[in-house]
Structure formats: structure tokens, C-alpha cells
């Protein structure tokens, strides 16, 4: 499938003009705060960097006072953010323009449909495809919610820039508005003073649904159906995009996730979508003024009108309005029910009648006036037992369908399009909650809980000491033969066990009241054996979520390390062979999900080893499923950076092994990229469209690489990857000075103290690299600009292969030209190297206290230079990013500013370690961390 890359069409002239305007406004705001001399100092730093005089730049920064640092840190943090906004606006403009003139671009859904429609099984593909972005709260989203809101204001103003240029909008007013928001941004705290709580993370992510995701997903789903009809393909209920969420349910290493946060995550979702429905229904109420004197209505709609709490004489002859009033009153009752949160009492809504003006969780403000106006009517109707709440979203959908059918039957079909059709589509996609919530916990916690249960029930005293075979035998017996619940004994339970059981009980409650889809899977971190999966089954059995025939929550193994990925084939062979598992899967539509960990496998073995091991594991696991008639679906735990599986989403999906995407794919969207991808409705639509198009493309496009050649390619990769893994581990785990280098020559200590998420930086006290979470590990290498997880070990391994035999370079060049996986792998390394900077990294190395520790940098530098030479040789390129001119131009805009910020950060770290910063001034380091992450556009 051939597409023009959208990013190559960006209007650099417009972006350059906008950046000039934004820089001028930021200069003015800085001048007002720091004075002319303060702004001159900042401009001098940029001049020194442009001249390449890094020693003079370092000296100038060292002479700055801490007060000078305040304004410089803010300036160099905010300018890259403003550049980002301009680029995002231009991207949205290009998407809309190309859609309107029917021009192709990468990931355009209509062109993907052209290819899919030619397949013999086009209908099955389109009916069943399901892409699930899963929003996580990993601690890499460093911007405050307030800053995100200011960003959106500036985004909306820049969207009007072309109209300003065309004279359609008053230039002076537009400029004044833009100036005001830049001024506010310059005077707003960039970072959080306190660490986020899980509750804050939940409410923050809800804002993305309010501002963009509900609209974008609804629009995309509607477009998907429209294109199918256009191709003459009749679909029943396609769900090309549904959302997932970890926030509130992911307790792996986060002690602050509890049964209450799980419940809050579910109920807040319901309140957000219900508020959306109530507003939409109110719009329909206002517009559907059809008179019964002039049009007919169905009996069903007439009955709804009779039940309406709107008894005004002025609406006696307006049955549709009264029907919508009836629907809205039921929605309000449903909202009140969820706000009460007491799912065991169906009259919970009525108890809120004394406090009618309720807070709207989606906005933090009161329920809108139109809701308030009808709340009292609705509650009065409840007291008269004439209006109930909707027990299911299906019941709400049925009422809307009744109105739709009435319109169709009475020649009023033209009224269905617009708001009504949009509402109907939203209900079909979301129901009464926005996203499926995943639960996740580490396998060691499950084992400890099961061991405690078995001991308290006098079954096994020393479960953890049993062999794997013995463990599986004990667990299977309990699952298949023992109907009792082990936790029913009177023996006191540990706090950990109590918390785990409470979460599982809440999960069952939510599924019982909100539906099966609200919580569908539980992920087991560090899955290393079959017993790890059966241990979770035992805990789910305790609350009635698992029995001998059915698992209401699917057990999803997460294979993370290189060793676990290599063993995943044998583990799943054994697991899928048990009769009880076969029955569970049969009752789950023959799907078994497996999660793949990109972050930890990279930290464990390096970029090449991680990428290749993941590739092979997918092939092997898919084959196991096919042998057993099971659809293996993969959940890709990818981060924002290449070091954590990131990179361009379209290329990442289309380079997956052919056949490994059956129809469903899930992938994490990590903290720092959520704002970039889904911060506004245009960006959200484009990124979701790309995910769906890429998935469809990979499902229908056969392997373009010659099968015989592919065998040779795999043998070459096996050899190179083994070498790369050894080189990487020799440095990271074998060099005696590496640990000290990482902790002294990067801002890892400062990153760990940054208030960017609710979760600790490590599961326990860090004594070695293996104890550190993958996210702060990658985040810190991004900050010191080495980007080590995205490339180290690549250059030497390829170079050894090239030098081993004449013609090997040509083989690698051929692989790059003909094998999508290999091309994507190397293109990501190219991108990472383009964002790295060894001059800056050298100055970070000087933060290390001893010469022995500083010498680690020389090893890294040699490998960086070798990797650069080898990658460019294989690509046949002269420089980085030759195939991504827009990204190259983008870096050209921003590098001078956030590179200076690195030098400022280095000086601040020096002062901090010499105890020359006050507590307030320490926050400046956090501001620089924020600015560098913003400039890179992906950080952890």
C-alpha cells in the first residue's frame, strides 16, 4: 500500500512564521519579568550555542545567579512547547485539507478500505477488527493539567492563524488573545508542587475524553461504517476503536491503587459519558420541535412522551421533545445512581434529592443549567415512581432506536443525521463507560497471597517452596475439585491479601452492575511459569470470577525479560493444554491475550535483542494458537521512546510479523505521549485513524519479503542479536563503574523526586540497575541526551557481522530495502541517534566524581560513533532523518533552545550536589526536566 507521508507535507513556512510570532511574545513576557538585561542574557546563551562554543556557553551559565536561572529555565522550557503546538496545528490542518481534496496521506482510512475491499473476507475483517489504545499513568507525563489547558487555548488560536492572514479574523484581537495566553503561561507554575494521587490521574485522563476522545472516536466509528456502506459491505456492529485504561487498576508496584480507586475509575467514567449524553439529548430536545399536527409518531415514541416529566402545556403537541425529556430524566437518574456509588441499593439516586445541584466530575463544575433545570423534575418523577434509571446502556440505546425508527417510518429520516446520529454512534461505542479497565499485579504478590490462603486452609504449609510441578498440581486440584473459598476461614489475613481480595470483590461488583466489558482482563507482571497464571485463577475464584467452566476476567500473562520471552512458547504450550483452560478460552470466543513487555526486555538485553526476541515470540505464540484453534491476541506494552518500544505507530504495526494480528490488537499509550496524540480532537482523530489503518493494512497485506530470503534474514539476525546482547550486558551489568556512572552522570535522582506520577520510581530500594523501573531508566538517558537504551550494542554487533565476510554489508542493505521489520528497527535507531548529543553527554559525564566512573563515557562515545557509521551505511544515507524531512526540520527549530536547557540543567545539578540551591530553587531542575522532555516529544 503506497501512501504519501503526511509529515513531509507540513508547511514549514507557516510553522516558521508562527514560531517567530510565539518567540516574539515569549520574549516580551520574559522582558516584562526579567528586564531587558535578563532577556539579553538568554539571547546570548542561544548565540553561544549556535556558534558551537560550548565551553563559553558552560562558563556563561556557571556565572548566572540562581535568579537568572529562574527565567532562563522557564524560557527554554516553554519555547519548545510553543513550537510543538504550532506543529500540531499544522498537522491537523494538513489532515483536514487532504481529506477535503481527497488527497492521500499515511494512514488515510478511505484508502485502506480500498485495499481491504478487494479481500475475499473483507466483511469478516471489517466486522471484527478492534484496535484498543490503553491509556496508562506511567510517570512520564510531566506537564500539569493547567499547562495542558493553556496549551489547548493557544492551539485553538493558532488554528485561526490562516483565517487571520486571509483577513477573516481581526488580526489585532487575535494577536492580543495570543499574547495574553503566552503571558499567562510564562507566569504559571510549570510543574506540580505535590505528587499526583491516583484519583488525580483518573480525573486528569478524563479530561482527554471530554476535550477530544469522545468526539474523535465517535467520528471515526461513523466514518468506518460510512466507508463500509460505500463499498457495499453490510456490517452488524463493528468496533474499530475501543479504549482501555490502566489508571485505577494497575497496582503493580503502586501501593496507592486500591479497591476504592478501581471503583472510582469505573464510576467517574460513567459520570463523564452520562454528562455527555445528557448534553446531547438536551440539544435534541431543543431542536426536535416537530408538531403532532404535522407529522406522525410511532406508538412507542407516543408512550415515551406520555411518561415525560415535562408536562408543560406548550409541549402537548411536541411528542419528540417530550420523548427526549423522558430519556433525559432517566439519564439524570442513572447519573445520580452512579454518583451515589452504592450499587447494592437501587434507590440510591433518590437519597440525593436534598442536594440537587451536584458537582460534575468531568469538569469540576456544577452540572450544567439545563441538567439542573430538569433534575428537580426528574427527582419529583422518581418520588412518584414514574421515572426509573437505565439499568443498562442497551435500554438507553433501544429508546434512541425507537425514535430513529419512528422518524424512518414517517418520512422524517433527514432528521437522523447530525446530533442524533452522533449520539446513537456514541452509545454504540461507549455504552455507560468509556474504557475497559485492566487490572495488573506482580506475580510475586499473587504467589504470596495464594501461599497464605493455602496455609490458612490447612492445605499446604510451604507452598512457595514447592517445585513448579507440585505447585500446578495443588492449584489445579483447588480449581477443579474444591468448591469452597479458601478465604472463608477465621484466620486473620495479611494486609496484602486483604487488599487483593478487596480489589477482586470490587471488580466483580462492577462487572455485575456495569457489564462484563468494564473489566475484561487481569495482567500478571513477570510471568515466569504456568503456576503464576493459576495462582491468579485461585484468587479470582475466591470472589466468584472464575469457576471450572468460565473465567469472567481473562488471565493475561506479561512476558517482560529476554529470558521470559524466550520461555513464553513453552509456558503457553503447557497452559493452553489444560482442560480447564480450554473451557475458559472457549467461553471467551476462543481468544487468549498475551502481553509483551518492550521496556523491561530492552533494559534487560538492549534494543536489538529486545526487538528481535519480541518478533520471534509473536511468531511462535501465534503458531501455538493456530495449532489449537485459538486466536492469540497481543497486547503491546510500548512506551513513548524507542528504548521502550516506541517510534512511529503506523510503521510499528505494519512491521509486525504477518499473521500475528488476527483482528484485535491492544497497545499502551504511555503518559508523555497521551497529550501529544490526544490533546485535541484533530490530533486524536488522526492518530486513531492511523492505528486502525495500520492494523487493517497488516491484516490484509501479505509478506513482501521472499520466504526463502526470510529464512536467511532470520539466521543473520540470530547471530547479530546474540552479539548485541553480549555487548550491551557487558556494559550495563558487567562494567563495575557503570552503576555509579548512571547515577552520577544523569539526573536519575532528580527524576525520581519529580512529582510526575503516583507510582514510585522503583518497586524497592535500588541497589543495582535491575531494581530500577524501566521508565525512569529510559527517562534519565533521554535527559542526558545519550539515549542509550535505543541504540547501544547495535553498532558493534552489525560491524562484527560486516567485517566477518565480504558482501555482508550488501546483505544488510538488501534486508533494509526488502524487510519491513528490519527497516522499522533501523529507522528507529536513526531517529534516536538524531536526538542524541554527545557534546552535551560529555558535560553530564563531568558530573561523575572519579576518573574511573567518567571513563565509562568513552566506551559509550566509541559505540555511538560506530553505530552512527554503520546505520548510515546500511541505510545508504549521508545523514540522519533523510526519510523524515519534517522531523529533521522540527528538530532544527527546537534544538538550539532545549539543548541550552541541558547545559542549564547540568549547572543546576552541580549546585544542588554542592548544596548551593534552596528548596525553592531545586524546582528549577524539575522545570528543565520538563522542558527537555517537551522538546524531545517523547521521554520515557
UniProtKB/Swiss-Prot annotation:
EC number(s) from the headed UniProt entry: 4.1.1.31
Q: Which residues form the active site?
A: 138, 603
What's one GO-annotated cellular component? cytosol
Q: Which residues form the signal peptide?
A: none
Q: What does this chain do? A: Forms oxaloacetate, a four-carbon dicarboxylic acid source for the tricarboxylic acid cycle.
NCBIfam families xref list = PRK00009.1
| Name of the protein in question | Phosphoenolpyruvate carboxylase
Amino acid at each position: 500500500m503506497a501512501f504519501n507521508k503526511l509529515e513531509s507535507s507540513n508547511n514549514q513556512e507557516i510553522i516558521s512564521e508562527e514560531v517567530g510570532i510565539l518567540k516574539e511574545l515569549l520574549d516580551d513576557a520574559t522582558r516584562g519579568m526579567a528586564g531587558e538585561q535578563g532577556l539579553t542574557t538568554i539571547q546570548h546563551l542561544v548565540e553561544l550555542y549556535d556558534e558551537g562554543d560550548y565551553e563559553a556557553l558552560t562558563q556563561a551559565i556557571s556565572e548566572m545567579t540562581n535568579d537568572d536561572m529562574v527565567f532562563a529555565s522557564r524560557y527554554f522550557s516553554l519555547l519548545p512547547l510553543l513550537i510543538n503546538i504550532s506543529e500540531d496545528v499544522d498537522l491537523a490542518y494538513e489532515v483536514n485539507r487532504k481529506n477535503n481534496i481527497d488527497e492521500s496521506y499515511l494512514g488515510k482510512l478511505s484508502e485502506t478500505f480500498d485495499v481491504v475491499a478487494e479481500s475475499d473476507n473483507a466483511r469478516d475483517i471489517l466486522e471484527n477488527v478492534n484496535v484498543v489504545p490503553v491509556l496508562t499513568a506511567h510517570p512520564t507525563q510531566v506537564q500539569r493539567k493547567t499547562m495542558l489547558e493553556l496549551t489547548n487555548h493557544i492551539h485553538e488560536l493558532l488554528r485561526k492563524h490562516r483565517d487571520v492572514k486571509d483577513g477573516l479574523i481581526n488580526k489585532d484581537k487575535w494577536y492580543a488573545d495570543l499574547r495574553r495566553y503566552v503571558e499567562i503561561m510564562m507566569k504559571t507554575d510549570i510543574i506540580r508542587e505535590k505528587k499526583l494521587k491516583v484519583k488525580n490521574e483518573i480525573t486528569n485522563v478524563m479530561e482527554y475524553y471530554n476535550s477530544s476522545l469522545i468526539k474523535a472516536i465517535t467520528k471515526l466509528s461513523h466514518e468506518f461504517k460510512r466507508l463500509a456502506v460505500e463499498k457495499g459491505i453490510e456490517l452488524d456492529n463493528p468496533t474499530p476503536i475501543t479504549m482501555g485504561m490502566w489508571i485505577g487498576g494497575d497496582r503493580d508496584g503502586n501501593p496507592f491503587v486500591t479497591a476504592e480507586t478501581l471503583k472510582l475509575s469505573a464510576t467517574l467514567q460513567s459520570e463523564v459519558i452520562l454528562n455527555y449524553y445528557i448534553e446531547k439529548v438536551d440539544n435534541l430536545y431543543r431542536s426536535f420541535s416537530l408538531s403532532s399536527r404535522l407529522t406522525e409518531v410511532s406508538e412507542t415514541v407516543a408512550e415515551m412522551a406520555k411518561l415525560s416529566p415535562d408536562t408543560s402545556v406548550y409541549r402537548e403537541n411536541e411528542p419528540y421533545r417530550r420523548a427526549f425529556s423522558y430519556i433525559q430524566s432517566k439519564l439524570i437518574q442513572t447519573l445520580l445512581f452512579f454518583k451515589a456509588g452504592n450499587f447494592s441499593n437501587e434507590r440510591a439516586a433518590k437519597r440525593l434529592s436534598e442536594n440537587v445541584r451536584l458537582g460534575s466530575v468531568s469538569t469540576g463544575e456544577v452540572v450544567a443549567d439545563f441538567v439542573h433545570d430538569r433534575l428537580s423534575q426528574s427527582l419529583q418523577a422518581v418520588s412518584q415512581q414514574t421515572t426509573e434509571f437505565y439499568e443498562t446502556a442497551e435500554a438507553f440505546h433501544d429508546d434512541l432506536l425507537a425514535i430513529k425508527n419512528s422518524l424512518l417510518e414517517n418520512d422524517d429520516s433527514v432528521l437522523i443525521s447530525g446530533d442524533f446520529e452522533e449520539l446513537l454512534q456514541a452509545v454504540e461505542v461507549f455504552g455507560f463507560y468509556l474504557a475497559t479497565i485492566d487490572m495488573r499485579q506482580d506475580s510475586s504478590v499473587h504467589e504470596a497471597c495464594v501461599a497464605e490462603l493455602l496455609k490458612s486452609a490447612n492445605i499446604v504449609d510451604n507452598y512457595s517452596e514447592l517445585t513448579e510441578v507440585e505447585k500446578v498440581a495443588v492449584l489445579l486440584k483447588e480449581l477443579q475439585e474444591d468448591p469452597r473459598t479458601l478465604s472463608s476461614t477465621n484466620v486473620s489475613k495479611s494486609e496484602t491479601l486483604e487488599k487483593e481480595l478487596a480489589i477482586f470483590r470490587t471488580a466483580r461488583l462492577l462487572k455485575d452492575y456495569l457489564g462484563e466489558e468494564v473489566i475484561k482482563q487481569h495482567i500478571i507482571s513477570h510471568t515466569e511459569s504456568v503456576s503464576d497464571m493459576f495462582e491468579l485463577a485461585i484468587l479470582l475464584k475466591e470472589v466468584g470470577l472464575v469457576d471450572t467452566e468460565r473465567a469472567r476476567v481473562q488471565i493475561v500473562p506479561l512476558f517482560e525479560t529476554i529470558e521470559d520471552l524466550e520461555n513464553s512458547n513453552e509456558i503457553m504450550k503447557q497452559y493452553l493444554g489444560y482442560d480447564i483452560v480450554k473451557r475458559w478460552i472457549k467461553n471467551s470466543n476462543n481468544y487468549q491475550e498475551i502481553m509483551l513487555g518492550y521496556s523491561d526486555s530492552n533494559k534487560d538485553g538492549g534494543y536489538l535483542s529486545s526487538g528481535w526476541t519480541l518478533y520471534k515470540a509473536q511468531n511462535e505464540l501465534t503458531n501455538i494458537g493456530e495449532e489449537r484453534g485459538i486466536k492469540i491476541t497481543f497486547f503491546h506494552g510500548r512506551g513513548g521512546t524507542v528504548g521502550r518500544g516506541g517510534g512511529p505507530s503506523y510503521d510499528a504495526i505494519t512491521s509486525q510479523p504477518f499473521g500475528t494480528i488476527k483482528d484485535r490488537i491492544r497497545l499502551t499509550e504511555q503518559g508523555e505521549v497521551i497529550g501529544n496524540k490526544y490533546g485535541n480532537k484533530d490530533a486524536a482523530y488522526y492518530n486513531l485513524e492511523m492505528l486502525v489503518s495500520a492494523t487493517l493494512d497488516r491484516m490484509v497485506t501479505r509478506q513482501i519479503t521472499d520466504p526463502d530470503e526470510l529464512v536467511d534474514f532470520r539466521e543473520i539476525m540470530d547471530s547479530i542479536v546474540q552479539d548485541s546482547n553480549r555487548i550491551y550486558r557487558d556494559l550495563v551489568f558487567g562494567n563495575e563503574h557503570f552503576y555509579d556512572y548512571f547515577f552520577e552522570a544523569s539526573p536519575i535522582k532528580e527524576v525520581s523526586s519529580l512529582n510526575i506520577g503516583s507510582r514510585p520510581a522503583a518497586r524497592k530500594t535500588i541497589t543495582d540497575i535491575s531494581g530500577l523501573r524501566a521508565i525512569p531508566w529510559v527517562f534519565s538517558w533521554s535527559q542526558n541526551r545519550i539515549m542509550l537504551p535505543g541504540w547501544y550494542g547495535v553498532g558493534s554487533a552489525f560491524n562484527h557481522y560486516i567485517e566477518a565476510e565480504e558482501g555482508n554489508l550488501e546483505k544488510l542493505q538488501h534486508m533494509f530495502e526488502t524487510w519491513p521489520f528490519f527497516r522499522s528497527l533501523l529507522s528507529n535507531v536513526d531517529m534516536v541517534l538524531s536526538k542524541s548529543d554527545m557534546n552535551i553527554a560529555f558535560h553530564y559525564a563531568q558530573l561523575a566524581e572519579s576518573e574511573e566512573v567518567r571513563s565509562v563515557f568513552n566506551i559509550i562515545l566509541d559505540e555511538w560513533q560506530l553505530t552512527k557509521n554503520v546505520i548510515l551505511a546500511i541505510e545508504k544515507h549521508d545523514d540522519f532523518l533523510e526519510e523524515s524531512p519534517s522531523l529533521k526540520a522540527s528538530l532544527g527549530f527546537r534544538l538550539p533552545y532545549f539543548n541550552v536547557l541541558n547545559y542549564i540543567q547540568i549547572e543546576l545539578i552541580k549546585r544542588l550536589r554542592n548544596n548551593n540551591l534552596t528548596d525553592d530553587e531545586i524546582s528549577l531542575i524539575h522545570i528543565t526536566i520538563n522542558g527537555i522532555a517537551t522538546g524531545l516529544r517523547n521521554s520515557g
